[in-house]
């Protein structure tokens, strides 16, 4: 009854298997894709009919990781998977971005893609596997989809591009780039790099696109064997007469409105034109569909902006194609934060802060590929007021998570190593105004805030968003795009980096036919823009401050004998807990004996260091210590010396005469001088008050003659 159809092929160093017809046969299509023991099960369900009045394409992509895939039980209270993690959200976006532009315009039937990770090899990341699975399932489904796409990860090791590097290889790589595209064109790039050149980045994109052709070929072969018939879907016929009537009423007026350079004024005027046009048309014929009229107006609006750009006219806000909007850069804008900056580019503004914490503040991520600790956190917030709207405020949405991750990638390459700067760093970008490329404003603001906080970043970084308008062979690359240019253009191309090279590159291409030459022009134009922004930023702050904020914790590092770690921690953490309370510091101990003491007050840190040195000091036989009586027993007393170490003063060692009752001589908490008589092989300490007293008396005696000699 079950008749699986399987296709195997070699993809770089991995073997990929595509299998369909075995599971989820009630879904529109389902594929199990495996790559060296990492397996992702991808299903697609498409509704045959669109909902009445549906005016957008409702595509949903869900990516979910099951802990059983790694042979683990979830660590949560309920012991089952909950809402998507940040990593799952990012991979869902990674799948969504290259497939969305391949559905035909006018197709508004609901489509859901669900990718479930069911087995994982710690060396093979499931994201590429899931992207291949989504492409295969959509291609098999018969849903109108102009795919398939291929997906590849590209690394750069020893000056060589590496296809789909393993997790271990990625640690050595200067590049982590994911590229997806059809047979003819690149559609999406997502990457982080250690300041590589424009040519190296472009080479990686081209390499990945060439290598992924084997995926596309094998999906096409699988479709020939197991694909469902293509849906008989046709776009709604275009009402040419209505289009012409709307254009006659609105086109010239919209063209004039798009000469208004202020965003709010322009939006207000465009809204008036649209409202008046729709009202006029409905008065002429009340059977017209208002949504349809809105779509026609949007198409005219798009055409107006695009044709002006292609004709070489000034852009919406009056700029030339490669001009950057006016910049305003300020640092130290918030008095009690560790570092802060306000970065404004035209009508886009980001208030960015940097906060320093200890290793205890690092985020522990329990991921499918294994547990890891993140000491650099980047959070991006996009409140509704930034675009003059009202809306829900709460947990971050997919877009905020994606933009935060991109901005983090832009800064990551210049962050100092933990051994040089042992702080956990959190950057938060509050977008206070937005009109295009707020993620790149966040990169610029983060660089400034980190320098203001005294974080020794390797170089300043800046980011820029590029756009593209293309008709036939005629194209124009735009620098520093506005929100409108992003929506109406054919490409969104974000580049972040330093003067030396690129740290992050993200591309989303909405059309086919973007050539290597066009990408080269865009990258070179972006470099010029990046250097211009860095020049303005350097006028505000050109190097990290020499010292961290007075409000930031200072981390002092000392080394102790690893054998003494247990003494500093104490039974059940009792000693270290008491130490932190007593000194008002945060103390962290590593397995190699490295102790990090964090305090905002230098005196508190010195006190903590002194106490740790006391605790870890070797007890010297014959030395006299001042100790405190901690316990009294019939045969003597226990006295704490040298940082919590406890020794026994036998009843015979309390005084130089016979002692009947210990409490006649000693009380709890009493401070007494004690001499160390012996430390046995088990670490037990024998003490004597009697000998300490005898020793201290003769020691003081010779001072009198010395004083006499001095007289």
Swiss-Prot record:
**Superkingdom, taxonomy of origin:** Bacteria
Q: Which residues form the S1 motif domain?
A: 622-690
Tell me where in this chain the KH domain is found: 553-612
Region feature (Disordered): 689-711
Give the record's keywords alphabetically.
Cytoplasm, Magnesium, Metal-binding, Nucleotidyltransferase, RNA-binding, Transferase
User: GO cellular component terms?
Assistant: cytosol
Sorted alphabetically, the Gene Ontology BP terms of this entry are: mRNA catabolic process; RNA processing
Pfam name, any one: RNase_PH
Show the GO MF annotations. Answer: 3'-5'-RNA exonuclease activity; magnesium ion binding; polyribonucleotide nucleotidyltransferase activity; RNA binding
Catalytically driven reaction(s):
RNA(n+1) + phosphate = RNA(n) + a ribonucleoside 5'-diphosphate
Q: Give the required cofactors.
A: Mg(2+)
Q: List, alphabetically, the PROSITE patterns matched.
A: KH_TYPE_1, S1
- Catalytic EC class: transferase
Q: Where is the composition biased (Low complexity)?
A: 694-711
UniProt EC number: 2.7.7.8
The listed locations are: Cytoplasm
Q: What is its main location?
A: cytoplasm
Q: Which positions are annotated as binding Mg(2+)?
A: 486, 492
Q: Which PANTHER family match?
A: POLYRIBONUCLEOTIDE NUCLEOTIDYLTRANSFERASE, POLYRIBONUCLEOTIDE NUCLEOTIDYLTRANSFERASE 1, MITOCHONDRIAL
The protein's job, in short, is:
Involved in mRNA degradation. Catalyzes the phosphorolysis of single-stranded polyribonucleotides processively in the 3'- to 5'-direction.
Q: In which family does this protein belong, per the annotation?
A: Belongs to the polyribonucleotide nucleotidyltransferase family.
Query: Subunit composition?
Result: Component of the RNA degradosome, which is a multiprotein complex involved in RNA processing and mRNA degradation.
Return the protein name: Polyribonucleotide nucleotidyltransferase
What species does this protein belong to? Shigella flexneri
- What does the record give as the organism's lineage? Bacteria, Pseudomonadati, Pseudomonadota, Gammaproteobacteria, Enterobacterales
